[in-house]
């Protein structure tokens, strides 16, 4: 998305500080767990049980983000109820029940404003590095032991009471990223946890124990067992993080990231992108273009390997095509700018300008900002589509 103007870096920083401060106050005064729809869900689950029995708790990312004052998107709930009990309880309600992962004890409740994923408490019986055979239980501590990181095993009930059997809140407060139990064993249970490790390391700039780093490097070959679709989903989550541009600051993290994604040949280009990121929003497609595109069509290999979406494929192809044009057409951002905005769209040209600066070391910041201002000032005419004049 285009910001609509060319804000200075200090102005944008001040805006972000104010926005985060307001959000923090808002979340403290109106915590997510007090939402009316969520309370209806918890009350429905509790029906038929005595008040001293905890039937459901929030868990995972929503609790972690609540504690760190981040925006909460996905809502995960752990419960002692079976999927059949959940379906029966919500059969004649305003919530639609979707069997998203019923083989693993998961269903999703969909309402007007929320999608809530409910999973029955469980323990792993057998794992193969990709999937697990599970047994359903009603023991909260045992359920916590099968989760990946301590910071993802913090539970929160409908009244805001924390249950933290793995001391995840302590690790979150002290910037520690720890597997629950033996790192080697946890990684071997599901090799996707290696990629998830990168996501949380980038997200919180967390301190990692040497045993964890060693276990990850020793098990990198296991990534080959994971479907490319699952890996791509995690990668896109990583690229959406505001801290991703700092990945080069940790040689250890960069090494692991490069081993998992050897297609990203141009991580150094991120250093130039860091100089201009404040001028526009940076999305995953821009980052992919910066790290992938070269004269050998490296991006095509990535698209094929990870079966990227048609949208991503088309966007990268368009970036590549126009970067080639930029080399040939010296007037691309000059006399031909209006024409190129008309045929490609203003958003695309803003992104292309970012990518071109990141890739081409000969482009100065002055040239970049000058081009950006010209793009933003162009008014693209809206033509009527109903035949009227």
Positions of PLM-derived features:
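Short, positively charged low-complexity motifs
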Residues: 2-4
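Catalytic cores of the polymerase beta-like nucleotidyltransferase superfamily
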Residues: 14-389
């Amino acid at each position: 998305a285009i910001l609509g103007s060319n804000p200075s870096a200090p102005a944008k920083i001040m805006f972000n500080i104010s926005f985060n401060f307001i959000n923090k106050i808002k979340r403290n005064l109106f915590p997510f767990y007090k939402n009316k729809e969520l309370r209806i869900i918890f009350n429905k689950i509790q029906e038929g049980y005595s008040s001293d029995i905890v039937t459901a708790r929030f868990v995972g990312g929503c609790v972690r983000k609540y504690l760190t004052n981040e925006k909460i998107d996905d809502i995960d709930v752990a419960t002692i109820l079976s999927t059949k009990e959940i379906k029966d309880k919500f059969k004649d309600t305003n919530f639609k029940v979707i069997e998203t992962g019923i083989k693993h004890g998961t269903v999703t409740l969909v309402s007007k404003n929320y999608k809530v994923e409910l999973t029955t408490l469980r323990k792993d019986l057998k794992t193969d590095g990709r999937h697990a055979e599970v047994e359903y239980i009603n023991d909260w501590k045992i359920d916590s032991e099968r989760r990946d990181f301590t910071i993802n095993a913090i539970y929160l009930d409908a009244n805001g009471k924390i249950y933290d059997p793995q001391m995840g809140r302590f690790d979150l407060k002290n910037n520690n990223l720890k597997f629950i139990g033996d790192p080697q064993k946890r990684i071997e249970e599901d090799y996707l946890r290696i990629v998830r490790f990168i996501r949380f390391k980038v997200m919180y700039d967390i301190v990692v124990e040497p045993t964890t780093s060693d276990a990850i490097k020793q098990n990198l070959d296991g990534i080959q067992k994971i479907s490319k679709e699952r890996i791509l989903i995690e990668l896109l989550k990583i690229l959406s993080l505001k801290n991703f541009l700092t990945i080069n600051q940790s040689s250890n993290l960069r090494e692991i990231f490069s081993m998992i994604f050897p297609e990203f040949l141009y991580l150094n280009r991120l250093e130039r992108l860091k100089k201009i990121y404040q001028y526009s929003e940076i999305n995953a497609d821009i980052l992919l273009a910066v790290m992938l595109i070269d004269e050998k069509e490296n991006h095509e290999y990535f698209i094929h390997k990870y079966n990227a979406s048609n949208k991503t494929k088309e966007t990268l192809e368009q970036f590549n095509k126009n970067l080639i044009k930029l080399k040939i057409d010296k007037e691309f951002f000059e006399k031909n700018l209006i024409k190129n905005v008309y045929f490609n769209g203003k958003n695309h040209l803003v992104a292309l300008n970012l990518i071109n600066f990141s890739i081409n070391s000969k482009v100065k910041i002055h040239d970049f900002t000058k081009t950006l201002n010209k793009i933003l000032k162009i008014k693209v005419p809206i033509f009527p589509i109903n035949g009227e004049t």
